[in-house]
Amino acid sequence: MFTGLIEEMGEIVAIDPLGDSLRLTVRGPLVTGDAGHGDSIQVSGVCLTAIEFGAGGEGTFTADVMAQSIRMSTLGALRVGDKVNLERAARVDSRLGGHIVQGHVDGTAELLSATPGESWRVLRFSLDPALAPLLVDKGSVTLSGVSLTVSDVSEAAAEEPWFEVSLIPETLTATTLGLLAPGDRVNVETDILARHVARMLAFKNLTPSGEGATA
């Protein structure tokens, strides 16, 4: 589990194709400082398992990206030199400064517009119609690993759903969201509670009427 509070921006230093998967090597001196083999590190919102670390204090780690993660996220489009958001898995005694983030991406969204304010920026993204019911005004959403509050959403009947988030200066400078231009895509993870409610509602009329169920 993660909190969506990015610890550092890392850099892709190597990409090695492995059949239908990828092996990424990422530079992140902070997140690798106390990491060990098998630890979880979210890379721009995708939970990956660290399998190797650079020797001699290089501050790099290597992780495999499976075919499904490539299909569902932006990781397959990364190039050497690209910046990524990094966060270590939360501990039991961690402060939950953002919200519960699993690192399980639901899909991607395209940046439609970026409207600057005095010291902030409002970003509007497209949204897969299947995900639209899972986002609510003032609810939580994770974009490329960053925990954010939804500041506006399109009407329920909109043919092309969208949503907005407002970024403070700290988020603009400390994460890759400040580097985005219209047309760029981000990884989207909706709130876990919203996903569970939607799933239960889908089974509302199929639930057995008895007191228990047998498999």
Per-segment meaning from a language model:
Residues 1-215:
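Conserved loop->alpha-helix
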